[in-house]
A protein has these predicted regions:
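Nucleotide phosphate-binding/pyrophosphate-handling subdomain across enzymes
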Residues: 114-189
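Flexible active-site lid/hinge loop adjacent to a nucleotide/diphosphate
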Residues: 2, 6-7, 12-98, 103-117
Length: 189
């Protein structure tokens, strides 16, 4: 959704790392798409017009993990019962890392970016930190990058903020569930 289209990249070096956001639609039709690291985020009843049932939606998202090779890593939320149930039903090649979304005060102190006031962005950061450990990246470098993030236009974009009022442009949200997640991530709404 942001950055350069992967297929247009010309100078790919062997150690290049790509971060790819793939929807349940893309995963469903990506028979040969195999990752070294996979994260499944935002499990909520989305795209049911396509998948018909929540169960089918989860199965589609879980396809990302099922297609992984040996020695790959899959990161899931520790308390996500839907994915834990799917793990019981399916054999996987990857090592499953269950991520606790609790953010320590030590980590909170390193975040100098209002982008992470949003609970969902903070949860996503927790996954990034877990992958960074596996890649043996230094926290100092990770936080330097994290603290440089800018909000995307139309996606949870804070337009105005003071003590009494917060105006957010989230017109990129495609469904009620997505908008609800945003609202739940702020206090006093």
């Amino acid at each position: 959704n942001i950055g350069n289209p992967l297929l247009l990249e010309k100078n790919i070096k062997p150690k290049t790392i790509f971060v790819i956001e793939a929807s349940s639609y893309q995963i469903e039709y990506s028979k040969y798409f195999k990752t070294d690291f996979a994260i499944i985020l935002n499990i909520s009843p989305n795209h049911l017009e396509r998948h018909r049932t929540f169960k089918n939606y989860i199965k589609s998202k879980f396809g990302l993990i099922k297609s992984q090779k040996k020695n790959s890593f899959a990161f899931i939320e520790k308390n996500n019962n839907f994915l834990k149930e799917e793990l019981k039903k399916n054999k996987t090649n990857s090592k499953i890392i269950k991520v606790n979304l609790k953010i320590s005060n030590k980590i909170k102190k390193k975040i100098k970016n209002s982008y992470f006031e949003n609970k969902n962005n903070l949860n996503n950061l927790k996954f990034v930190l877990e992958i960074s450990k596996k890649l043996k990246l230094k926290n100092q470098k990770v936080f330097k990058v994290v603290n440089s993030f800018k909000e995307l236009n139309f996606r949870q974009q804070i337009l105005y903020k003071n003590k009494k009022l917060l105006i957010i442009n989230d017109s990129k949200s495609t469904n009620f569930s997505s908008s609800l997640n945003l609202l739940e991530s702020y206090k006093n709404i």
